[in-house]
């Protein structure tokens, strides 16, 4: 009899487990597994697009460098100058037709993920971004590869979400996965690629987002490692200076103050000049003429400063100059050139120019330390790497990404601890200086641009997670912000009437809200789901 009672209780548990919710949760696990496999596919496709993008930039830079290093006769410069000018005029025409391909790409990706922007023709725009970024770089401008790679990845994510007919609320997961894979392809840094999505694009730590971006980043990073087996940053030799703890903290504090002040100047100048440039009424071909002229003059002086200046930074970190004034002059020249290039709105990122400026600033600080006997010449590269990380924190305000990225691409874990300390102090000082992150400024400029057609009402899709705040709640019981309304609940391929519906994990909830509330409500609503 006792055995029969136990069997009956067990059967009751099985019946309770085999409820709609129980089966539904198991079904969701299968859906999640599918999403993770699809995100790896997104990473593979992104790698197959973004890595060739990186390779072509690398090839064209060395082709251009070889031309200027050969010191050709003066008449050979005329066709190259005119060709570069024509290239930029063509790219500006492309940007005029498709405004979303202009600039870096991180603000655009954020806008697509939070629902403010829609990629209407993702394949055409992706090809245009690819071609526009390569042509802008080949003209010698100081632009980076990371922003376009991130946006290319988001285009791939958008295309795959259409091909696979994935759920509406999961589309942003593939967009985020593609964006992370793009950065991984640009730097072969999968961990940092996941962090930048969380810190700068998604701006919210969701487990599913972290997993999808990490999986996609690992696959894209593997593709990048196959094409670029030797990471040039690994060739930088680092020797850590030996200090007593409190002496070390003192120098870290000084470096953080210097980086914070310079970062404030860097960001303010970039923002101010971008607005001034937009107000100049000269035709695009006139603006491009002066831009090519500046790029050409710098190419004649120091060709390694073109293309973002990454090659110049690597050369300085491995066997750099010891002349403080010369390095300072070059840093200022690179900064002015980067301001002109980034403000043009041509396809290309500002990530690498920012890293280069931070590295050269660190070299100056290191050389001053050598002159006064604080450190040895062999320690300068150590200061450069720490300064690169901190300067990225100051300008972009992504401390985790900056710290992990420098550690990951260089392979020098001895810079991790000082990067954490100096980066943390820099973050605090930039908050005191009331600095706005550069990507936030770019995003705000984008959504207020004349070409941006703003709708009055937008729809945000969120997926209900297990044990979240909204899990198990009746829609009628929810107290949402004013003019924020749930218009549809999608479950198991069916659209349910919101009134009277109890939310369960996996539900795709569509929320309509005013346009001015998207940025304010996106993070709270996603966190509730």
Describe every region a protein language model picked out.
Residues 1-450, 456, 465-466, 490-493, ...:
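Alpha-helical transmembrane segments and immediately membrane-proximal extracytoplasmic
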Residues 521-529:
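Short, compositionally biased
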Residues 466, 471-517, 521:
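Cytosolic Rossmann-like ligand/nucleotide-binding regulatory domains
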